[in-house]
Structure formats: C-alpha cells, structure tokens
Amino acid sequence: MKRHLARNAKAGVPPTRPLLACAAWSFVLLYGCAGRPTGVLEPVAANPSAAQVEMLVTTTRSRAEKPGEMFSGERALSPTFAEMTVSIPPDTVRKAGEVAWPSKLPPNPETDFATLKAVEVDRGAAEKWLNTHVRKSPDGSVLVFIHGFNNHFEDAVFRFAQIIHDSGARSVPVLATWPSRGSLLAYGYDRESTNYTRNAVERLLQYLARDPEVKEVSILAHSMGNWLALESLRQMAIRNDGLPAKFRNVMLAAPDVDVDVFGSQIADMGKQRPRFTLFVSRDDRALAVSRRVWGNVSRLGAIDPEQSPYKEELAANGITVVDLTKIKAGDNLHHTKFAESPEIVRLIGSRLCSGQTLTDSRLGLGDHIVAATAGAAHTVGTAAGLVVAAPAAIVDQNTRRNYVHHVEALAEPSGATR
C-alpha cells in the first residue's frame, strides 16, 4: 500500500514499563489463573485410539534445563531444529478447537494431548525430514505457523497440532517458534524476540522457496506472530526483488500490528505477493489493551473493514477480510474466536481444503461471519484450510503460569534496569 491505512493516527511510541504493567494487569483481571503441569513434552507410549500429528520445528529459543520442556523463552545464538509427534485424543472426548491439556503427568492419550516424540535434530536431518514428508504429501504444500505473544514452547506445539488435526489440512506442518517467555509482563521482551527471529524465519522461507519438491507455501500467524511473519516476508521481498509464486497464502489471525506499519510492509513486498487474508474482530479486548500500549494507534486485527480508509485500501490491494465480530466466543478477551468455534473449524476448514473459497456463499454461515473486502469476494486459495483454527494461547486460561514472576516484576521500581 502506498498510502497508510490510518492517516490520522498518531505515531506509535515504544511501550514503557508502567504501560506494560497496566496492560498486563488488564489481562490478569480479565482472566483468572489456572495451573497445569509442566514437562508435558516428555514422550509417552502411543495409544491406538488417538490420532497423531507430526511436525518439524525451527526455533530461536534456548534449550530448557527442565525435562519435558525442551525449549525455554530465552534467546539462542542460532536456530535449532526438532521433530515432534503429538497424540490427540478421540473426538468423543474433545471438541474441535480445544487443546486438551493434561491435568497430571504422565498424560493419558485417551483423554489428553500427549507427546510421542520430541527429538532435537541438526539441519541436515531437518531438511531430510521435510523432503520425506513433502514427497508423501498429496500436493507438495507446506504450512508455516508462527504463534503469538505469551506462548511457552509447548503452547505453540500443542496448538499447532490441534490446528492441523481439526482443519484436516494436508500441508506439511512446520512450526516457527520464537523466544516468548510466556509471561503477561514480558510484552516488550516478546516483541523484541520477534525482531530477533526475523533472519531465522527469512532463512526458512528462502529454503522453502528454493526447494523444488515444495510446490506451495502458506503461512498462518497469530497475534504478535503476525509482526514476525510480515517483517520476514518484507525482508525477503526486498532481498529477492519480490516473493516467489509458490508463496500462495498468508493468513493473519488477530494481528497485533500497527495499521500504518502494515501498509508500509505490504508496499515494500511489491505487486507479486501472496494472497493475504485478514481475520478481525472489533471486540478483541486483547488488541484494545495493545492499542493503549502503542500510543493509541489502531491494531490491524481490530479494525472495522467497512470504514474508510480501511475499506478502500483493502479493496485496492486485494486483501480478503473476514470479520468475526459477531461470532460468540467462550473467552473473555474475544481474542480466541478461531479456537473457540468448532463449527468454523470444521466447516471452513473442510471447504478450504477442498479448494473452495472462503467467501463462497455455500458455506451457509449467514450473518455469523461477514467476509468483506469492499463487497468483493477474493479467492483465498486451496492451502488455507488451517485458518479456521487460529491459535489463541495468549489468553488461554489453562496455560498461564509463573505468576510469582509477574508479581515480582510489578514490584520493581519503574526506573529499574536489568
């Protein structure tokens, strides 16, 4: 976009410690604290009644010291790779969109998500894994998932496994995970960790672009992970003078991104770019908090796509918008609507995997989903089937922990440095 989406917005300012503390307590007040066991990535024996999802992981996280955690929220000097297999309990004990976290260890594969394989591998083994799985896939497609703010490593692994399973996606799953501390007060650290990871994600995308076995690449990002996805694509486009044709779909779920900066990022990618699908909800309270942190500049995931200047700019750039404001979700922050709506997971996921467009009237969702890009229906594409299960671990009441750290951080003087 040559013109910024929000012309009248004030320039964003870096979040200060008091603002971050205020934002964090907003999350805490909206969501209660519920614990769960740590070390859930310790492998267990498979159960024949459970489904399995295999994925390749690339991460800039440091190795964890505790068994069963694998990777921490600290930053590594170079990317690391891993092969993961996740067991998912039968649909009779879990509804689509849910991550069934174990209440105790070891997990029971009949009722819980469980880890069957968690092995760190070198780059050569990772490339071999990818090549083998792409050759086995029906269409040679790869899906890269980038999680959002406040995610531990296991959050990202289990959520991505849920997305792949519930959507019925045929793409080869590749998880790109960055050093999030999984703390509500680590917003600034997490944001800088996405910047820290840009080069690693770009290298992943460059490899997929060069690999002749990979026929199609789709990217699904959630919340703060959208910043990392957009920056990596922008960086790649500038370096390569455009993006490859095999990069078909980029799906931005509840993006915690400044609307002005998004306009600049899209413009920098040039005219040859993937199809972008934007999932917004105007009642997203998590993004409302983020907006206050960033100087009251609108966040991309909370815009009204029918209002100017968004409507005109989105239409001019062929960006599909799916407005989920009317979807009733189970979470207080309305930031988890994809994960909380099993009907959308099943219905839209199956349609997209079958090659139908997201705005196809045959979906029959009536007024519950408004797909609008200046009234035009734009094609989303075949490999976008997993969009419907966009992750939401940022506010998952069953995944929050380490509140002693939160209290200690709030108790520090506002001028303290580390």
Regions found by a protein language model. Give the residues of each.
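N-terminal secretory signal peptides that target proteins for export/translocation
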Residues: 1-15
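The conserved beta1-alpha1 loop
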Residues: 144-148
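Alpha/beta-hydrolase fold active-site loops
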Residues: 141
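Lipolytic serine-hydrolase domain surface
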Residues: 34, 38-117, 127-131, 136-137, ...
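Sec-dependent N-terminal signal peptides
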Residues: 17-25
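Gly/Ala-rich beta-loop-alpha elbow adjacent to hydrolase catalytic centers
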Residues: 221, 225, 229
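C-terminal motif of bacterial Sec signal peptides marking the signal peptidase cleavage site
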Residues: 30-32
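Short substrate-entry loop that stabilizes the transition state in hydrolases
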Residues: 152-155
